[in-house]
A protein has these predicted regions:
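Active-site-proximal, Lys/Arg-enriched surface segment
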Residues: 77-165
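An anionic, glycine-rich sequence signature occurring as long contiguous blocks
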Residues: 229-334
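Short amphipathic alpha-helical "interface-anchor" segments enriched in bulky aromatics
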Residues: 6-9, 55, 60, 321-357
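Basic, short loop/linker segments at the boundary and entry of helix-turn-helix/winged-helix-like folds
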Residues: 3-39
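Short, positively charged, Gly/Tyr-enriched micro-motifs
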Residues: 28-96, 164, 220
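Electropositive, glycine- and tryptophan-enriched low-complexity nucleic-acid-binding patches
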Residues: 138-201
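Short, conserved catalytic/metal-binding motifs centered on acidic residues
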Residues: 40, 55, 72-76, 112-126, ...
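A short, flexible helix-boundary coil/loop motif
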Residues: 1-4, 16-21, 255-272, 346-416
């Protein structure tokens, strides 16, 4: 019987099977090969199975019964705990380099630059389950009607994602350590990625206002990257100076974008000047209100509301002949990591369901890495091999996951 179309594509484009087979593992006398374990977890994540227990069921008597064969949940957890996370990171970097060679990072709007976004997300928390790598915090919550203070164990990860491409491509993740903040974790991830991928792999970094700090900005510039970061109240001196220089908000027409650019605004904390772009965007939308009349009867009324949003973006980018609206485009591209990466991986990729955790911190790291790899390669397959064949494609990632699982269950005969 012919191999699955998804696996054939990954082998043809990325030589994926050979790379997975070369991954080192720490088991001495394994009953099942490391590639078999990796394939079960990876394909389970691609089919959007939420837990290792579900993958065990599918391997025994479900869609993977012929492709993988019987595997227990304990076997999967034991093997994942003995994979080296650095080796999985090296695999991810090799795939990222191949993506760049294949032109996946090209963009119609980024003016030849490869733009990456960095952000963090909490993936799990518990008052009971924990591992040696868990972070801790004290939380007040209600238990049996009483307000109690308990230690909560949780994990956060930082993610670097290319956002200038046609679809977001995560480059790497890093688990935040106990006592480490999100900015320090993200900076360590950036440094490790560029050390492995090369200093010219990325051109520009976009981030939320949390990252607009003097040490982080200096470290990013030392890596050779330009940056565009949201400017908010966490830098009050810079924000006040930008508001003083730039004009106040005008009367914007519906759907109109107003933009002001100050190429040199003094940043007192760093004793330097940075560029600041201010945008005012007015959006007109209709909403429905339900009101009651004098007799208490409900009446639906529609009204038009004009919503105005103001944003500031700080940057070290030398625009030259490039219009300042480019800074606005870069700043808004940061939302891709929230709306398309974190949200999709949480709802469809089950990022926040750590099916292996208690006492197995390394297994959780490797499981999360494999889920991110599965999400990335499924996106590549979906956009380059599925959507590209349709003029108007109505399929989504959930539809693709169901079809992948069905094709494993009912393989097509080889016509060769």
């Amino acid at each position: 019987m012919r191999r699955h179309q998804f696996e054939s594509y990954l082998d043809k484009v990325f030589d994926f099977s050979a790379r997975v087979e070369a991954l080192p593992e720490g088991r001495r006398y394994p009953q099942h090969s490391g590639k078999k374990i990796f394939d079960a977890v990876f394909l389970g994540a691609a089919c959007q199975f939420p837990a290792l227990h579900r993958i065990e069921t599918e391997c025994r008597q479900g869609v993977f019964s012929k492709r993988i064969g019987a595997l227990s949940e304990d076997t999967l957890g034991y093997a994942l705990a003995r994979y080296d996370p650095d080796a999985v990171l090296a695999l991810s970097c090799a795939l990222s380099r191949q993506c760049k060679r294949n032109g996946l990072f090209r963009s119609p709007w980024a003016r030849g630059r490869i733009v990456a976004a960095v952000d963090g997300i909490e993936i799990c928390s518990s008052f009971v389950r924990s591992c040696e790598d868990c972070m801790e915090r004290r939380v007040h919550h209600v238990v049996d009607g009483e307000l109690r203070e308990q230690i909560q164990y949780y994990h956060r990860i930082s993610v670097v994602t290319v956002v200038s491409s046609a679809f977001p491509i995560p480059l790497g993740i890093r688990f935040q350590k106990n006592g480490e903040n999100e900015v320090a974790c993200s900076l360590a991830l950036l440094q490790e990625l560029l050390e492995r991928l090369g200093c010219r792999f990325l051109d520009l970094l976009v981030a939320d206002a949390l990252y607009l700090q003097a040490p982080f900005v200096a470290a990013v510039e030392a890596l050779g990257l330009d940056w565009v970061i949201n400017l908010k109240d966490n830098q009050p001196e810079l924000l006040a100076e930008a508001r003083r220089i730039l004009p106040s908000e005008g009367s914007a027409d519906p759907q109109e974008l107003q933009l002001w650019h100050a190429p040199q605004v003094h940043w007192l904390v760093t004793d330097r000047t940075v560029g600041v772009v201010k945008t005012v965007r007015s959006i007109e939308y209709r909403r429905q209100l339900v009101r009651r009349d004098e007799l208490g009867r409900k009446h639906a009324e529609k009204e038009t509301v004009l919503e105005t949003s103001t944003n500031f973006y700080a940057s070290n980018l030398e625009l030259g002949s490039i219009p300042p609206v480019f800074i606005h485009q870069l700043g808004r591209s940061r939302w891709i990591i929230d709306s398309e990466v974190f949200q999709t991986m949480t709802t469809e990729g089950h990022l926040k369901k750590p099916s292996v955790h208690q006492g197995r911190g390394q297994a959780l790291m490797v499981l999360t890495w494999i889920r991110v790899l599965a999400f990335t390669l499924t996106l590549v397959f979906f956009h380059r091999h599925v959507r590209s064949h349709f003029k108007n494609c109505s399929l989504g990632l959930c539809d693709l996951a169901r079809r992948l699982a069905y094709q494993f269950l009912v393989p097509r005969p080889d016509s060769s």
